[in-house]
Every structure is written in C-alpha cells, then in structure tokens.
A protein has these predicted regions:
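Long, soluble alpha-helical segments
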Residues: 19-20, 93
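Sec-dependent signal peptide recognition
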Residues: 2-9
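Conformational coupling and interaction surfaces
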Residues: 24-30, 47-62, 186, 190, ...
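C-terminal motif of bacterial Sec signal peptides marking the signal peptidase cleavage site
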Residues: 15-17
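Active-site histidine-anchored catalytic micro-motif
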Residues: 20-80, 109-225
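Residues in well-ordered beta-strands of folded domains
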Residues: 100, 170, 296
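Metal-dependent C-N hydrolase catalytic cores
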Residues: 72-134, 347-362, 366, 371-376, ...
Length: 383
C-alpha cells in the first residue's frame, strides 16, 4: 500500500512538473487591439487577423476591438464590431480567444478614463487590463488602430501599463513625417499623444510617409500585394473561405460558420478574381498591407531571398546562402505634438521608443509578393 501511495505521489509530482513546464512553451503572449469590423471597414484588418491565429510562435491571449462610432454607419454601410471574423477564426483553430469592444468616442482630454461609456464598451478595457494582470509572463500588445483603448487603460492603471507586465507595445500608426496626419492617429489625436508620451516600451511601425499611406519609405511598413488569385488555390479550403468571406464582405450570408465548411460558390470565386483595392483608393495594387512587419517582429520571422525567391522564415532557419532583407529597430527620441503628429531622431543611448526601418522598401515589396502567398498557404486550421 505504501508503495502504491508513493507511486501515486510521484505521478502527481510528474504531472505537476509537466504542467508547470507547459506554461512557458516559448510562445509570445499577445493582446491584439484592432479596429476590426464586420463588414470590414478596411479588409486588411480581417485578412491580417489570420496571422496571429496561425503562427505557432504566438499565444493570442485577447482581442480588443477599437471601434470608432462614425464607422459603424458610413456611406450607407452598417457595421458592427468584428465579432464575426473573431468567431470564425476561433472556430477554425479550435480556440476561444476572448474579445470585447472598447469605447467608441474620442477622448475629451488626454486624461480621459471613459468611465461614462456604456457597459458594453467598458468590456474591452476590462479585458485588456485583466489579461495583462493575469498573464504568466510579460505580454506584447499589438495596436493596429487608434491608440484610444491603450490611452484609456493607461489612464486607469498607469501602474500596470508601465510595469514589467508589458513587454513591448507594437504600434502600427502614424507617419514617418511630421507633415502628414495618418489615419490611425487622426482617429483619436489626444489618445495618440497620451500613449506616445507615456514612457511605455514602444516599437513604432508608421503606416505612412509625407506622401501618404500608400507610399513606401524606409521608416514605414506599407506594401502592396499585386495578386489575390492565390487565395483560391490555398490547400486549406476553410481558410480560403474565411479570406473570401471577409474580403468580399459577405453580409448577404449570415451563416458565417457554415460558409467556411461548404464549397466556395463560383460567383464568389469570380468576385475575388475581380476584386481590386485600387478601385477604392486609386494607387495600384489589389490589396494593401501595413501589418506584416509587426507580426514578423513579434514572431521573430525574417524575409529572405532564397534561390532568387522571397520567403518568410523563422530567424533560426535562415540558411547560409539566404539573402536577408534588412530590417532594424532604431532607438529614437520622439517629440510628440498635441495633435498626435511626431518627429523622431535616431539616438545611440537607451530609449523607450524604437522605430521600424527597412533598407530597401521596393525590393522588400517584391520579395513579399513572392513570400506572402506561400506563407499564408502554409497555414492550417484545426479539425
């Protein structure tokens, strides 16, 4: 009997040890703050959402939907916070990623805590704070919309947001020039100024240059995807259907889960072949992308030219003959105006803010057009 008890105790200790080791599985814990809608306001948010769900390197802890009231009804289109794409991907990957919406209206002052917002809109801030507080290790926060949810959380719990519980805040917003007010900053200028002046550990990935959001400079992350037909050839038909559903804004199909499981209607395949973002924005390219650099940095991925072709690979799998497309994170001094515009100066000393840099943006775009379809084509849903 004593031997059985000892064996049982050893088994419990072994299970406990295994359980503890699984907590630190090497994955990067991430909270995503995204201006995610359905139907999409910018389809890029819905397309890019597939990345953190798919990457083995990322543990997606929560999604906070950064909603702006004016976009819920715009040009005759009615939208809701993006619960549908979140539920679609949680279904496809067998996950239950918590999601909630944050306050819809701009800050009234840099110190605004938005405590008068409706209860539904409080849930996003509560989710953000709770997820940081309960995380086993420092979390990365990825913000791809306005900085309103971050500013509100910072105003409510500066002790938490400025603590070591937050590893890095990755901000996809702003312009590399102080002469252009970029979209995400313009959504809430007071929130942008509050966050960028906060002293949080921030990596900035500007979306625009002085020439606008569709220009390619060394300090912004925009690139254009020239072709979308590869989506129809994806080996995972359910992920293909997710992309088609969201790119085409299929609000005429309320069966958003069964759409993923059924054969793709030929009419939708034809519509995807005809889809071009430049019909709306007039700058060339069938799809516009601002977030790839963010997710590659978070997941420690690099863009290489391998045997003359672009590929996205983990840092540890770069081959001797690969030509790495150079990217850096510069430490910078940041001067932030009250309207959210900022100027930066590269510095050698320690700084809480780093700036994304790419040496050859046009070459990077060419390589990404070769690499991105293969990368997305490698993603697999869970059955």
């Amino acid at each position: 009997m004593k031997h059985l008890s000892l064996l049982f105790l050893c088994s419990l200790l072994l299970l406990s040890a295994c359980g503890n080791s699984s907590k630190d599985d090497g994955k990067v814990p991430v909270i995503l703050i995204s201006d995610l809608y359905y139907p999409a306001q910018d389809i890029g948010d819905n397309v890019d959402l597939l990345t953190p769900y798919s990457l083995d390197q990322i543990d997606l802890k929560a999604i906070v939907m950064d909603i702006t009231r004016s976009h819920l009804k715009e040009d005759g289109i009615l939208r809701d916070p993006g619960f549908i794409p979140v539920r679609q991907l949680s279904y496809l990957f067998g996950k239950d990623v918590p999601c909630a919406a944050a306050p819809y209206d701009s800050l009234s002052s840099p110190e605004d805590r938005k405590e008068d917002a409706p209860a539904f809109q409080q849930k996003g801030i509560e989710l953000l704070l709770h997820t940081i507080e309960e995380a086993d290790k420092p979390v990365h926060i990825v913000s791809t919309g306005s900085l309103r949810p971050l500013a509100i959380a910072l105003n409510r719990r500066p002790d938490l947001l400025l603590s070591d519980k937050v590893a890095t805040v990755h901000v996809a917003a702003g312009s590399s020039s102080e002469n252009f007010l970029e979209w995400n900053i313009a959504l809430d200028t007071l929130a942008a100024a509050r966050v960028l002046r906060s002293g949080m550990k921030i990596i900035l990935y500007p979306c625009a240059t002085e020439n606008g959001p569709f220009d390619k400079g060394v300090n912004n992350a925009f690139w254009a995807l020239w072709d979308l037909d590869w989506i129809l050839d994806m080996s995972d038909a359910r992920l293909r259907n997710y992309l088609v559903y969201n790119i085409l804004r299929k609000s005429d199909r309320p069966d958003f889960l069964s759409y993923l499981e059924n054969p793709l209607p030929e009419s939708d395949a034809a519509a995807l072949r005809a889809f071009r973002s430049d019909r709306f924005y007039g700058s060339g390219g069938r799809h516009y992308v601002w977030e790839t650099a963010v997710w590659m940095q978070v997941a420690s991925l690099v863009l290489v030219e391998r045997e003359g072709v672009g590929r996205i690979v983990p840092e540890g799998e770069v081959l001797d003959d690969d030509l790495v497309c150079p990217e850096q994170l510069w430490p910078v001094r940041l001067e932030v105006a009250d309207n959210g515009l900022f100027r930066f100066e590269r510095c050698d000393d320690a700084s809480s803010v780093r700036m994304y840099f790419r040496m050859e943006p046009w070459k990077q775009e060419r390589l990404l057009n070769e690499a991105f379809p293969v990368w997305y084509g490698s993603f697999r849903s869970v059955r």
